[in-house]
């Protein structure tokens, strides 16, 4: 711990400084699967103007009058299906904690670096972890939204929340925000390795490999959000790295919500169409998620698989996210080391 008391007057209070913080931030998670934890989480998530850009006069009556009365039970049941019962938490929290611990171990050669993790929605909050890093002497903090592809509804809202807290601080730490890494060679190599490793465990070869990204409304893209372009580039680079063609590799978008048109093609409609067209074996992966969560474990490994098999498909496999694997941590570590340059 840096104290450098010799640089201070003899009667100066003991202070810590000279540290650099790294804060890994993912989307968030409810604290439990029953009604009230789910309602608190969904209220925070769906009231974010970056997520739902509709007029508050239009959206809030729908949110508080309909959505938050009906959706907590439905979403809670879905979380219950993929809950980490051993730790009594979501796997997103389990993996993000592990990523933070492994990152701290990987950066031991920088004794002045402190690693922590937070969630944009739910706990631990971004504000609480910024305060914790400051208390440990961090005068500089690298803020790492764990999203390879930039979107206003993901990366930007993490940055918003961090700076919202900084507005309340008398003494602000210096902040760097990690840029998108959708085309980083280490990221593409990690994804390609995860595909090869997973397919090597199968006794069959998929006819089609689908990269399913979380969708956003088309209106967001038309307003200038680069997310769609980032997803397309990631998919193209991964396809090239795997030596596949557009005949056996495709990109889709999932998790649409509400009446708007979202980015297409839709994942659920696509797997249904492939099965009806006679495709018997497919593999689906989620390159935009650094950790498995509700959208990958329940929506893809569960629901999408059921749709495909119900409509005539015979073999379905979900390729896990990079999570806290060696390949996954290699990607995150390389990004962090690059972005820390000049600070350590």
Curated annotation (Swiss-Prot):
Compartments (UniProt record): Cytoplasm
Record keywords: Cytoplasm, Heme biosynthesis, Iron, Lyase, Metal-binding, Porphyrin biosynthesis
Record carries keyword Lyase: yes
Keyword Cell inner membrane annotated: no
Pathway assigned in UniProt: Porphyrin-containing compound metabolism; protoheme biosynthesis; protoheme from protoporphyrin-IX: step 1/1
Segment forming the signal sequence: none
Protein name: Ferrochelatase
Gene name as annotated: hemH
